[in-house]
A protein has these predicted regions:
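Short active-site segment of divalent metal-dependent hydrolases/proteases
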Residues: 116, 120-124, 241
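Histidine-centered, transition-metal-coordinating active-site segments
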Residues: 1-99, 107, 139-144, 148-167, ...
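Active-site alpha-helix of zinc metalloproteases
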Residues: 112-113
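Basic, low-complexity intrinsically disordered segments
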Residues: 103
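A glycine- and small-aliphatic-rich helix-loop capping segment at beta-alpha/alpha-beta transitions
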Residues: 125-142
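Broad structural signal for hydrophobic residues in well-ordered alpha-helices, predominantly aliphatic
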Residues: 99-100, 132
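Short acidic, glycine/serine/threonine-rich loops at helix termini
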Residues: 124-127, 206-208
C-alpha cells in the first residue's frame, strides 16, 4: 500500500523518511487477520493497517466508556461542559493529526495511538489510578494490614502495579471482546507501543510490572520514548491538550482559584508575544465576554507552531545523519525534548500544577473518589462473590490454583465459577483466591473499567445509604 497521506489543501504528499510506513514487518499482527491479508494480496484493501486499528478502537466498549470518566473533576457533578476523558481523547487526536500532517508523519498511526491512549484509565482520573496502584503494590497501609490480618498475606510480595498506559495496552490485547479469532483487538505493534509510551513507564521512579507486557520485546521497553515519530507526536499532543484545556476548564467550571488563574494568565501575556493576542488584552474581560476559548486557542496554536518548527529541525538533522531505520526509531525528536525548553508551555504547566490541580474543589473530590474506590476494593476482598458473574467466569479461565480450578470444573454449572462452590469449599479456598495474582489483576481490571457514575452506584449497592 502506498505510503502517502492526503493533505488538507488537496495535494498528496509522501511520508517523510522518518515517518512509519504503512507496510512492512512492523504492521504484522499477533494473530493473522485472514480478511485483511486476503484483501492486501488481492490489491483491493481500502484501509491501511493503522486505519483498521483506529476503527477497531473507536468501536470498542472501552472507548465508549470514556464519556463518563473524569479528566480532572467529577463528571455529572459540575458544569457538564467540562471535559471528560473522551473529549480529551478526541482533542489529543486532533492536535496529533495536525502536527503529523505538518511534518509529513503518518496521520493514521498518530490518530490510532491518540484514540487508544487513555482506554485503560480508571474512574476519577489519576486519583483512581493511584488508589489501584497503591492497593496492588502494597502502599495502601490500610488494605495491606487487612490482608495480613485476615489472610496472612503480604500483597507487597506480589510485585503488582497499576498504571493507565500499561492498562490501555492490556485492554487492547486481552480484555476487549467481540472477535472470534483472537483476544483483544489484535492491533499492530506501532499502535500498542505508542499507547504504552505516551506517558512514563515508571511510577515515582519505580518500574511498572505488567504480565504479558514487560516481556514483550516488540515494545522495546529498554527505550523510554516511543519508537515511532507518530508515538512521540501523540505524547507531545497529550501534554499540550491536558495542560491548556485543564486551565480552560478551571475557568469555565468556576473553580475557586479562577481569579488567581486569570491573574497568572495576564502576567503570561506580559511575558510572551502570543500570536493574535496583543499586549493590551484583558483576560478578565475575555472571561466575562465568554471568549476564554479563543484565548486558549491562541496559546495552543502558538505552542503547536513553535513545537512543529523544533520537530522539523530535529527531523532535518536526523535525516542528514543518514539514519535508515524508520521503525523502530531510536532518537527522541518530538516529545519532552521539545516541550522541556518551551518557556511558554512550562509557564502554563506551572499554572496548571499550582492553581488547577492544587485546588480546594479538586482536593475534596479526590478525597471522595479515593474513599469510594477503596471501599469497593475492600468489599471485593472481604467476599469475592460480590464481583459480577462475568468477572468470576474470567477468573475460572485464568485461575492459577490447580486444586480450585479442578473443583470449579466439577461443579457442573455452565458457565462455572466460584459463586457455585459449596459454602465449605468457598471458605477453604478464599485465602488462595485472594492470594492469586490472576484474581487480583482481574479485580483491578474490573474496577479500572468502571465509569465515575458506575463506581458511585456500585458503592451504594455494596454499602447502601444515601447517595454519596
Amino acid at each position: 500500500m502506498e505510503d502517502w497521506i492526503p493533505l488538507t489543501y488537496g495535494k498528496n504528499c509522501r511520508l517523510d523518511p522518518l515517518a512509519t510506513p504503512n507496510s512492512g514487518s512492523h504492521v504484522e499482527r499477533k494473530y493473522q487477520d485472514k480478511k485483511e491479508k486476503k484483501e492486501i494480496e488481492a490489491g483491493i484493501a481500502t484501509r491501511t493497517p493503522f486505519q483498521i486499528d483506529k476503527d477497531r478502537i473507536i468501536y470498542s466498549k472501552a472507548f465508549r466508556r470514556l464519556i463518563h470518566k473524569t479528566q480532572v473533576c467529577f463528571t455529572g457533578e459540575m458544569n457538564e461542559h467540562i471535559r471528560t476523558r473522551l473529549t480529551h481523547t478526541l482533542e489529543v487526536s486532533q492536535i496529533a493529526r495536525s502536527i503529523a500532517r505538518q511534518v509529513h508523519a503518518n496521520e493514521d498511526l498518530a490518530e490510532a495511538i491518540a484514540l487508544g491512549h487513555d482506554l485503560g484509565h480508571t474512574p476519577f482520573g489519576h486519583t483512581g489510578e493511584k488508589v489501584l496502584n497503591d492497593f496492588l503494590s502494597g502502599k495502601d497501609e490500610g488494605i495491606k494490614k487487612k490482608l495480613l490480618e485476615k489472610y496472612e498475606f503480604d500483597i507487597t510480595e506480589m510485585k503488582l502495579h497499576f498504571k493507565h498506559n500499561f492498562q490501555s495496552v492490556r485492554v487492547l490485547i486481552e480484555l476487549e471482546e467481540g472477535y472470534k479469532d483472537f483476544k483483544g483487538l489484535n492491533l499492530t505493534c506501532p499502535v500498542l507501543e505508542g499507547i504504552l509510551k505516551h506517558t512514563k513507564l515508571e511510577s515515582n521512579g519505580q518500574p511498572i510490572v505488567y504480565e504479558g507486557i514487560n516481556e514483550n520485546g516488540a515494545f522495546h521497553l529498554d527505550q523510554k520514548f516511543s519508537c515511532s515519530l507518530e508515538g512521540q507526536i501523540v505524547a507531545l499532543a497529550d501534554e499540550i491538550a491536558q495542560v491548556c484545556h485543564d486551565i480552560e476548564d478551571a475557568i469555565e467550571g468556576n473553580y475557586d482559584s479562577k481569579e488567581i488563574i486569570c491573574i497568572q494568565l495576564q502576567r503570561l501575556i506580559g511575558e510572551f508575544d502570543i500570536n493574535d493576542l496583543g499586549k493590551n488584552v484583558d483576560v478578565k474581560e475575555m472571561v466575562a465576554a465568554r471568549q476564554i476559548k479563543y484565548f486558549i486557542s491562541c496559546i495552543i496554536g502558538q505552542v503547536i507552531s513553535e513545537a512543529v518548527i523544533e520537530i522539523r529541525k530535529n527531523m532535518k538533522d536526523l535525516n542528514k545523519s543518514g539514519l535508515k531505520a524508520k521503525y523502530p526509531l531510536n532518537k527522541e525528536i518530538a516529545t519532552d525534548c521539545v516541550l522541556d525548553k518551551h518557556k511558554l508551555f512550562q509557564r502554563l504547566k506551572e499554572i496548571e500544577n499550582n492553581f488547577v490541580i492544587n485546588n480546594y474543589m479538586i482536593d475534596r473530590m479526590n478525597g471522595k473518589s479515593s474513599f469510594v474506590l477503596r471501599q469497593i476494593i475492600k468489599a471485593y476482598l472481604t467476599n469475592p462473590k460480590q464481583l459480577p458473574d462475568h468477572v468470576l467466569e474470567l477468573y475460572t479461565e485464568v485461575c492459577s490454583v490447580p486444586a480450585l480450578k479442578d473443583k470449579i470444573r466439577k461443579i457442573g454449572s455452565t458457565p462455572a465459577n466460584i459463586r457455585y462452590l459449596s459454602k465449605k469449599d468457598f471458605e477453604n479456598y478464599q485465602p488462595a483466591i485472594i492470594k492469586d495474582r490472576a484474581f487480583l489483576r482481574l479485580m483491578s481490571d474490573y474496577v479500572a473499567s468502571m465509569t465515575d457514575l458506575y463506581a458511585l452506584q456500585e458503592y451504594q449497592k455494596l454499602y447502601g445509604g444515601e447517595s454519596i
